[in-house]
Structure formats: structure tokens, C-alpha cells
């Protein structure tokens, strides 16, 4: 992962940003469709349904979007209030008081949030099953590790920090060992959540602790209120997340100043991320970066000899 070049990182983060952005059109505009399939298929279904936009839901989404963005222009102390938190609190309280039936919420779409921590599940002692799952488990562990380190690399670019890959993977592995004992599944570092954290000012490990404690409080105390969160508000927040991840100004600057090969690498990585798969995109981007270095390495070797 340390050999992934900046054009590759910008390409796949921009690609993920586009996927997130398009994936929220349904909730943002209140579209009465359920897009499925590959990205281009979902995009086509969504574009065809734009004649059925729900104006009321869209208005809620636009107000939420304004609440997310506005704190950036407020005076210093007020400006430190995270926009996503402000939008969530205001719009959730509004929905809880008004009870708009036409506005989809977490509760109406997915049901009530269970108000209890997961129970201990124990281990299965069927050793034949262990060997059967060994291959998939190794594959999931490898892919999860790659995704987490990619997420950490993106975080380093955004926050100007430097992560410790050994600590990251040790902590993730420890969590994934104990999570299944309580009915959980393998987790990784997520680029979207990481970008949201950093843009909201959370660039230290404390942000992860606050995230975990907040989830526990939501499950045990705030579940009835969380059920009133409008999906349009979540879509508005993810619109901003997608924009921040895409790093449009940085990408445009790269197009103007970078060598053509770097621009080509960015475009290929971006396209493969959106239309194929993240892992394929990163592998292709890294391969292109290495191929670009071969002539330089040969010339350097000849110079030294």
C-alpha cells in the first residue's frame, strides 16, 4: 500500500465519492425506484425516474444540505459545530414533532432500532466447518486489510498525518476476532466515514472512541429518536461527504500540472472504481505506476554501473 501513488489515491477516492453521490439520489429527491445492479444500470434507472421527483422530500434534503454547509461561514465558536451533527439534530427533532408521514425515515424504511446490545453467541466447535471457512476468512482478512490501509492513506492525505500500519491491522484484527462472538461480522476502515470524521475535525484516535460511545448511546438510549432521522437528511450529509472525498480542486490542479501519464493513471483508476471494482482499480493503478517507473529504474541502474 505504501507504493500507491497520489494519482491512484485521488482516482479511487473520487470514484468512491461519485458512487456515494449517485447512490443517494433516491433518498435526496424522493425517487420512487429501487435501483439495482451495476453502477451504470443504477444510474440509468435513476435518470429515468427524475420526472417523479418528490418536491417536499427534496425541500427537506436542501434544508439539510444548507445546515451541513452553513456552519463553515459562521463565527469561530459557532463554526466549530459540525454541520452534519447540526443537520441531524434539527431535522430529526422537526420530524419527531411534526410526524410527517410522507417523509421516509430510518424507522419507516428499516424498522425500529433494537434497544439492547448483541448477546454472546459463543463458538461453533464443528472443526470441519472451520476448515471449510478458512479460505474465505483469509480472503476477507486480506481485502479488509487493504481497504483499511487505503483508508488510512486517504486520511493521511486529508489530515497531514502518518499512520502506523502495524497498529492499524493489529487493532482491526483484534476487533474482528471478538466481533463474531456477539453476532457481528468483519469490519474495516471505511473511507467515507473517515473522510466525514476528518472534515468534521476528528483527526485523532479519540474520534473513533467517540464514534463507538455514540453508537452505544444511540442503541441503549436514543434509539426511539434515531428512528425519526429523515433519510433525506442522511442523503444530504453524504452529498457533502462525496464532494469532500472527490477532491475536485486537487484533481483539477493535477490535470493542469501533472505529467500526462499521471493524469491517465488517475482517469483509469477513477473509471475502474466507478464501473468495475475498487480492488481492481487499485491493482490497475499500482501496476501502471510501477510500469511508469521501469524506464527510470533502468536508467538509474545503468548510471550506477
Predicted regions and their residues:
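Transmembrane helical cores of multi-pass ion-transport proteins
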Residues: 1-304
Amino acid at each position: 500500500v505504501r507504493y500507491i501513488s497520489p494519482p491512484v489515491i485521488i482516482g479511487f477516492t473520487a470514484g468512491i465519492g461519485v458512487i456515494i453521490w449517485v447512490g443517494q439520489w433516491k433518498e435526496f429527491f424522493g425517487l420512487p425506484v429501487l435501483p439495482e445492479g451495476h453502477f451504470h444500470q443504477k444510474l440509468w434507472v435513476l435518470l429515468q425516474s427524475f420526472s417523479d421527483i418528490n418536491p417536499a422530500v427534496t425541500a427537506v434534503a436542501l434544508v439539510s444540505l444548507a445546515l451541513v454547509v452553513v456552519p463553515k461561514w459562521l463565527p469561530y465558536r459557532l463554526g466549530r459545530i459540525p454541520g452534519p451533527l447540526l443537520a441531524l439534530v434539527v431535522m430529526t427533532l422537526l420530524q419527531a414533532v411534526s410526524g410527517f408521514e410522507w417523509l421516509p425515515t430510518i424507522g419507516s424504511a428499516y424498522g425500529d432500532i433494537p434497544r439492547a446490545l448483541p448477546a454472546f453467541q459463543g463458538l461453533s466447535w464443528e472443526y470441519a466447518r472451520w476448515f471449510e471457512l478458512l479460505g474465505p476468512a483469509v480472503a476477507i482478512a486480506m481485502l479488509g486489510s487493504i481497504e483499511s490501509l487505503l483508508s488510512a492513506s486517504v486520511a493521511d492525505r486529508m489530515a497531514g498525518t502518518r499512520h502506523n500500519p502495524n497498529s492499524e491491522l493489529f487493532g482491526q484484527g483484534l476487533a474482528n476476532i471478538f466481533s463474531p462472538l456477539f453476532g457481528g461480522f468483519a469490519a474495516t476502515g471505511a473511507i467515507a466515514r473517515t473522510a466525514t470524521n476528518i472534515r468534521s475535525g476528528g483527526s485523532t484516535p479519540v474520534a473513533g472512541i467517540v464514534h463507538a460511545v455514540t453508537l452505544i448511546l444511540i442503541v441503549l438510549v436514543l434509539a426511539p429518536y434515531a428512528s425519526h432521522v429523515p433519510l433525506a437528511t442522511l442523503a444530504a450529509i453524504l452529498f457533502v461527504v462525496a464532494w469532500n472525498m472527490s477532491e475536485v480542486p486537487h484533481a483539477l490542479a493535477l490535470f493542469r500540472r501533472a505529467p500526462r501519464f499521471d493524469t491517465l493513471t488517475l482517469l483509469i483508476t477513477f473509471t475502474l472504481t466507478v464501473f468495475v471494482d475498487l480492488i481492481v482499480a487499485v491493482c490497475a493503478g499500482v501496476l501502471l505506476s510501477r510500469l511508469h517507473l521501469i524506464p527510470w529504474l533502468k536508467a538509474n541502474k545503468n548510471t550506477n554501473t
